[in-house]
């Protein structure tokens, strides 16, 4: 089967902050030892205050991102309110579990801010969903990322501090994991805004780490 021959690697991280959440990924997509893309998108905006990161099969991730965005839009129309982070995580969990015998080859983070506060959920390929109370990393570079996150995370960290820590964690993984690399994407979400950092802003932070 193709899944026995094609492997995907990546690094994604999520941090719960006192004023929001931060999600970050690198941009490399691989097929075994082959670098298939240096511009892979791994963070998807789901609602105005919720995003999803993906690790795993690119095709499965893109399809799920489209499907989840449509379903959340329908939810908003029917309920006349935005879904909570937990509601989106539950939707994704149920969807993945419904096809568990032919699973989507993905590991996801759903993070955002709603009326209950800042939340991040990690979801495995067959729908297991866990609320992460502080930090989380997924993908082949996660061991290196966790080392940085666990040494530097604080319960009172704010989103701006968390952006720098997330970039540092991804950068550490990129140096040691061959399946991670080729740039970084970062999103910070607060009660008031959803911000995707520009390449220039990310590069300025990286310069301080080199």
Curated annotation (Swiss-Prot):
Keywords, alphabetical: Autocatalytic cleavage, Cytoplasm, Hydrolase, Protease, Proteasome, Threonine protease, Zymogen
Residue ranges of the propeptide: 1-9
Keyword Protease: yes
Cellular component GO terms, alphabetical: cytoplasm; proteasome core complex, beta-subunit complex
InterPro entries on file: Ntn_hydrolases_N, Pept_T1A_Psome_bsu_arc, Pept_T1A_subB, Proteasome_bsu_CS, Proteasome_sua/b, Proteasome_suB-type
One Pfam family of this chain: Proteasome
Main localization, broad class: cytoplasm
Regulation of activity: The formation of the proteasomal ATPase PAN-20S proteasome complex, via the docking of the C-termini of PAN into the intersubunit pockets in the alpha-rings, triggers opening of the gate for substrate entry. Interconversion between the open-gate and close-gate conformations leads to a dynamic regulation of the 20S proteasome proteolysis activity.
GO BP of this protein: proteasomal protein catabolic process
Residues annotated as the enzyme's active site: 10 (nucleophile)
Entry function: Component of the proteasome core, a large protease complex with broad specificity involved in protein degradation.
Family: Belongs to the peptidase T1B family.
UniProt-listed HAMAP family: Proteasome_B_A
NCBIfam families in the cross-refs: arc_protsome_B
Binding partners and assembly: The 20S proteasome core is composed of 14 alpha and 14 beta subunits that assemble into four stacked heptameric rings, resulting in a barrel-shaped structure. The two inner rings, each composed of seven catalytic beta subunits, are sandwiched by two outer rings, each composed of seven alpha subunits. The catalytic chamber with the active sites is on the inside of the barrel. Has a gated structure, the ends of the cylinder being occluded by the N-termini of the alpha-subunits. Is capped at one or both ends by the proteasome regulatory ATPase, PAN.
Protein's recorded name: Proteasome subunit beta
Organism encoding this protein: Ferroglobus placidus (strain DSM 10642 / AEDII12DO)
Lineage: Archaea, Methanobacteriati, Methanobacteriota, Archaeoglobi, Archaeoglobales
Chain's gene name: psmB
């Amino acid at each position: 089967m193709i899944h026995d021959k094609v492997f995907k690697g990546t690094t994604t991280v999520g941090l719960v902050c006192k004023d929001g959440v931060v999600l970050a990924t690198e941009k490399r997509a691989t097929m075994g030892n082959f670098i298939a893309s240096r511009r892979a998108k791994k963070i998807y905006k789901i609602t105005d205050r919720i995003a999803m990161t993906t690790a795993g099969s690119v095709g499965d991730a893109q399809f799920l991102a489209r499907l989840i965005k449509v379903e959340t839009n329908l939810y908003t129309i029917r309920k006349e309110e935005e879904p909570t982070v937990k509601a989106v995580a539950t939707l994704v969990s149920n969807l993945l579990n419904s096809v568990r015998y032919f699973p989507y080859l993905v590991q996801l983070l759903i993070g955002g801010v709603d009326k209950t506060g800042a939340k991040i959920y990690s979801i495995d390929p067959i729908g297991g969903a866990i609320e992460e109370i502080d930090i989380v990393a997924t993908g082949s570079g996660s061991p290196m990322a966790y080392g940085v996150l666990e040494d530097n995370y604080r319960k009172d960290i704010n989103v701006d501090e968390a952006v720098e820590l997330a970039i540092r964690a991804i950068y550490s993984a990129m140096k040691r994991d061959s399946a991670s690399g080729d740039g970084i994407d970062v999103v910070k979400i607060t009660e008031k805004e959803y911000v995707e950092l520009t390449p220039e802003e990310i590069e300025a932070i990286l310069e301080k780490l080199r």
